[in-house]
């Protein structure tokens, strides 16, 4: 079972990835992790990737796909895997298909942008302890003050509203063509097309988990 998990920043992909991975006994595959591992090990692909990164350029799709193919030969992928943050682009999706890497399911966790912005921009954190609050859902007793120490809370740069909006713009620009590509394969009756599930991402974490697992177990 090979699964691609899609969803904008802030929809809870990390949490749901863990549930899927544990339920089906398949590893999460992250291109970032693969790159770091290959560079650290000094493999031919790692050396090539490091050269590109050191020059300030983006690692090519060719190198990324080669890393994915290499990762899939590992024994822990014998029953499948969960792709985390990959493919990101239409070019990568087409390259997967061209190289015969079959995908069984695509799960999109769907949350409206307005909800995501509220979730992320409302976060506040106590940096020293890591304690996290939310101005609406889990507010501190005193505005912007840590309950235990009385020290000020901080809003991370990534959680600022303008930053969240920009990240969402990038996500939609990259992912909407990807979604259209896979849906077209399915609608055209392609026998190799993955099954596509769009999962409502609002509600309790456990409810979202149950929706995803129910879809994948049908």
UniProtKB/Swiss-Prot annotation:
Protein keywords: ATP-binding, Cytoplasm, Kinase, Nucleotide biosynthesis, Nucleotide-binding, Transferase
Nucleotide-binding found in the keyword field: yes
Top-tier EC class: transferase
EC number: 2.7.4.3
UniProt region (NMP), positions on chain: 30-59
Localization in the cell: Cytoplasm
Any Pfam family hit: ADK_lid
Single GO MF descriptor: adenylate kinase activity
GO biological process: AMP salvage
InterPro entries: Adenyl_kin_sub (IPR006259), Adenylat/UMP-CMP_kin (IPR000850), Adenylat_kinase_CS (IPR033690), Adenylate_kinase_lid-dom (IPR007862), P-loop_NTPase (IPR027417)
Binding of AMP, residues: 31, 36, 57-59, 85-88, 92, 156, 167
Pathway: Purine metabolism; AMP biosynthesis via salvage pathway; AMP from ADP: step 1/1
GO cellular component terms, A-Z: cytoplasm
Subunit and partners: Monomer.
HAMAP family (UniProt xref): Adenylate_kinase_Adk
PANTHER family found in the cross-reference section: NUCLEOTIDE KINASE (PTHR23359)
Similarity remark: Belongs to the adenylate kinase family.
Domain notes: Consists of three domains, a large central CORE domain and two small peripheral domains, NMPbind and LID, which undergo movements during catalysis. The LID domain closes over the site of phosphoryl transfer upon ATP binding. Assembling and dissambling the active center during each catalytic cycle provides an effective means to prevent ATP hydrolysis.
UniProt protein name: Adenylate kinase
Gene symbol of the encoding locus: adk
């Amino acid at each position: 079972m090979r699964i691609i998990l899609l969803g904008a920043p802030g929809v809870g992909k990390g949490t749901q990835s863990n549930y899927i991975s544990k339920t089906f006994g398949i590893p999460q595959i992250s291109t970032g992790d693969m790159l770091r591992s290959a560079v650290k090990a000094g493999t031919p692909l790692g050396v090539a990737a490091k050269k590109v990164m050191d020059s300030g350029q983006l690692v090519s799709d060719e190198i990324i796909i080669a890393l994915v193919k290499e990762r899939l030969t590992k024994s822990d992928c014998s029953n499948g895997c969960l792709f985390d943050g990959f493919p990101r682009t239409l070019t990568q999706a087409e390259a997967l298909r061209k190289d015969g890497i079959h995908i069984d399911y695509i799960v999109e966790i769907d949350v409206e942008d307005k909800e995501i912005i509220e979730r992320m921009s409302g976060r506040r954190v106590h940096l020293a302890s890591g304690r996290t609050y939310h101005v609406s859902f889990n507010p501190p007793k005193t505005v912007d003050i840590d309950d235990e120490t009385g020290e000020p809370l901080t809003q991370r740069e990534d959680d600022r509203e303008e930053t969240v909006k920009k990240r969402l713009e990038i996500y939609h620009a990259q992912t909407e063509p990807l979604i259209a590509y896979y849906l077209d394969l399915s609608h055209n009756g392609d026998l190799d097309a993955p099954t596509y599930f769009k999962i409502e991402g609002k509600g309790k974490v456990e409810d979202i988990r149950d929706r995803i697992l129910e879809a994948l177990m049908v």
